[in-house]
Amino acid sequence: MSFSTEDVLDALELAAEKPSFPCLEKLFDRFNARVPFESASKILRNAEVSDPNEKPRVPDVFWRDFLDSGTGGTCFARVAAFDALLSGLGFSTRRALGRVETDFDHAALFVEVGGREWIADVGFPLPGLVPGSGGEVETEIAALSAAETDRGVGVRFVSGVPDGPRRLEIFRATVSEEDFLALWRKTFRPDSRFLTAVSLMRRDGPRMIKFARGEVRVDDLHSRTRIPLLAERARRLSEVFGIDADVLARAFSLAGDPEPEIRDARITAYLSVDADPGKAFAAIATPDGYRRLMEGVADVAGEGWKLRFSPPGAAESGFEEEVTPDAGGRSLEIRRVYPEGREVRLAFRVEERDGATYLVREAILSGAREDLLKNDYARGRLAGTLAVDLLAWSRFL
């Protein structure tokens, strides 16, 4: 090991401590906050290094690049780098493989501290440390449930935004350095998802900030905000993720820089409920059901799916809505028109994921709203307003 643990700790704004669980937790959280999960460095490494045996960005390369340009890496690189850092600080660690989609496509660490093993999965990454024997884990971003399996520990997300893989397995067997490197090298196959597109992710307190396909997504425990970046993506992403803009620009030149599929930002709130998806939608799927939902916050006039809403006792104020139901998609698409002519698109819908039912409320904003990348108060206030509607809906179930 030739990288300086002192320099890395300085960059992470942490002091060296004796190995302990609180120290491990601080290192884990700060690593996920400051060291981005990103594919840009992998894309550049693949293009610049022709020898397959030398393509993996081993810890010395990983930490040098982090200190120089703010890059991080993807699964195997992150696990190896965090392992080297922990080992340099005196922690007892061992590497293990796992499964997200196929066996051995994932890696993580087991760390022994205080007579107990913990899974430090910085490769996915999970939002918190997981007991090696299983258990329930609450974090600001999502709750996790871990249970022992025949091969190791299965981990599933039981809350949070219902998107992406919601289950993974960490195998208990220790993987040798030789086997770890062999599997790592295989991740440089030409069709690898991390070589064909620039993707970025880091934790920011109670939020996960992600970038893919031209848009930034900000996820918290109950909502997702999608913000399209319509211009100067390398520069804007450098500001958000702390990665050198030239690194991002070069990665985009190799992997492509597609335009976002949306032009207007949108905020989506989610609420998990113990209800059949069809019955959940049926509660608001008729004009009477929708009126009943909205009568809790406004006076409602009109017929069918064309309605007018106004504050109690102020019929001259308010707005009009035209609702389009989609029974097959379990959704209501709403066009809201204010007196000055401004229009807002909203939706209610029901989604099912891994056997769980989610009530969903979405608002499409006007414009890209890049200000929401910095103004978390405004983002949270808008998401909170949508969440209130979901709570009202849930009372009818």
Q: What name fits each language-model region?
A:
Residues 260-301:
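Hydrophobic ligand-binding cavity/cleft-lining segments
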Residues 288-345, 353, 395-396:
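Glycine-rich portal/gate segments that line the openings of hydrophobic small-molecule binding cavities
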Residues 1-29, 87-89, 149-262:
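N-terminal accessory/pre-domain segments preceding catalytic cores
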Residues 2-70:
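Secondary-structure boundary elements
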Residues 44-104:
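Extended, compositionally biased flexible segments
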Residues 80-147, 154-158:
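Hydrophobic/aromatic-rich core segments of domains that either
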Residues 338-388, 393-395:
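Beta-strand/loop substructures that line and gate deep hydrophobic ligand-binding cavities in soluble
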Residues 97-99, 146-148, 325, 348-354:
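Short, low-complexity Ser/Thr-rich regulatory SLiMs
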